[in-house]
Amino acid sequence: MASGDLYEVERIVDKRKNKKGKWEYLIRWKGYGSTEDTWEPEHHLLHCEEFIDEFNGLHLSKDKRVKSGKQAGASKLLRDARGLPVERLSHRPLEPGKSKPSSHKRKRVNSPLSRPKKGSSGKAPDRATKTVSYRTTPSGLQIMPLKKAQNGLENGDAGSEKDESHFGNGSHQPDLELNDQLGEQEASDCDGTHSALVENGVGSALTNGGLNLHSPVKRKLETEKDYVFDKRLRYSVRQNESNCRFRDIVVRKEEGFTHILLSSQTSDNNALTPEIMKEVRRALCNAATDDSKLLLLSAVGSVFCSGLDYSYLIGRLSSDRRKESTRIAEAIRDFVKAFIQFKKPIVVAINGPALGLGASILPLCDIVWASEKAWFQTPYATIRLTPAGCSSYTFPQILGVALANEMLFCGRKLTAQEACSRGLVSQVFWPTTFSQEVMLRVKEMASCSAVVLEESKCLVRSFLKSVLEEVNEKECVMLKQLWSSSKGLDSLFSYLQDKIYEV
């Protein structure tokens, strides 16, 4: 039948209890024969109390049903909320001349929820019947409006349709662990969209007022999955709008830590521009003041970070050299300073190449995990630039003067294993399991005390903070002078122009 059609009830023929202990009534539709009778759940019989009273002999107590206002002599309507295909489970074939009710444009009647007398008979007649799948609210008080566009793609919707289409097969158990019930209750506190999602994933109500949550094992997995999903949605809704407006990075609030992913939409290979660096600084500022215990920095794509966006530099410095050189140098200074002053542990996951400033900031972080595919290069002298990101101080301290000079002056490339053996990288993982290994270790760190993590970093980094800030200032002053001079700018332009022609 079409979901919007209405059909008129003629009378109730019989009633029964299904395998879940819920009452169903056999409805005779006006204008149709006995072969078209259908079993309808009690909560679908809205505004049909008179038919139920007549069938039960008018012996139902008033406290089990809530009388709704109705006009005497008015025809009773039962709304057809059948959003799913009708399955016909017949004990005998239908007569060839009879057509399905769906072929008739008749109107069917709405009926309110009523509870039958417990002592009534519940045997099903041996006749041609058909089971119908419905979409209902968890409370079972009324039929959900058939607006599948809102919830049709959400988690739990498909599962509820599947379970309801097998209504009465006895395979589902109502028992559930306490934490699952709490999870469903908590999820119901979300906004309209999320509460609708939870409602469609729960199913219909049991007679005793509990919830039919299907199989415990299957339901527990679905609940845990939906709980994590809804928890993130609730957090994003509660955040300040300005905190969510990131164009070139992705910020995720995980349990115990904040995850920042470089995902530049305005530059290639996650190259850095002043605008992108400003977004990272904002994300660091937010993570420093929330309940996160640590910060995870990673990237989307095959390249972690390709350093400064040189095409951006050419365009900006060509238009207004003095003004833009000051602005870009200050953006780099503030970007690096944000890493130096961040009090919580910073974990970096290097999934691919890290070049220039993308590699220079790694010593400012606390733990660096790299994929086997990652490699590191800081060709500052080659591209006519001076070192940035405090690499003029941190690289000699970590790698040794000889290797640091080779990287800064000659642009030597370090593999992940070489960087690990030299102390630039903490540990190297196989590419296929890199993300899983990183997340496992980050979650273990997030289970530690926030105070212990922060104080431990303070003990390790406190004596370096003033030194790094001073080095950062000097490096940015040098970059500003270089970009402000015509000689330094022409040298940069000629190099980048040659690289473009080579490509």
Curated annotation (Swiss-Prot):
Subunit: Interacts (via chromo domain) with histone H3K9me3.
Region (Disordered): 66-177
Matching Pfam families: Chromo, ECH_1
Alphabetized Gene3D superfamilies for the sequence: 2-enoyl-CoA Hydratase, Chain A, domain 1, 2.40.50.40, Lyase 2-enoyl-coa Hydratase, Chain A, domain 2
Compositionally skewed regions (Basic and acidic residues) per UniProt: 88-98
Highest taxon above the source species: Eukaryota
PANTHER family: CHROMODOMAIN Y-LIKE PROTEIN 2 (PTHR43684:SF2), PTHR43684
Keywords, alphabetical: Nucleus
GO molecular function: histone H3K27me3 reader activity; histone H3K9me2/3 reader activity; methylated histone binding
Polar residues: bias regions: 130-140
The keyword Zinc-finger is annotated on this UniProt entry: no
Cellular component annotations (GO), alphabetically ordered: nucleus
Protein's recorded name: Chromodomain Y-like protein 2
Basic residues bias: start-end ranges: 101-120
Localization annotation: Nucleus
Positions of the Chromo domain: 7-67
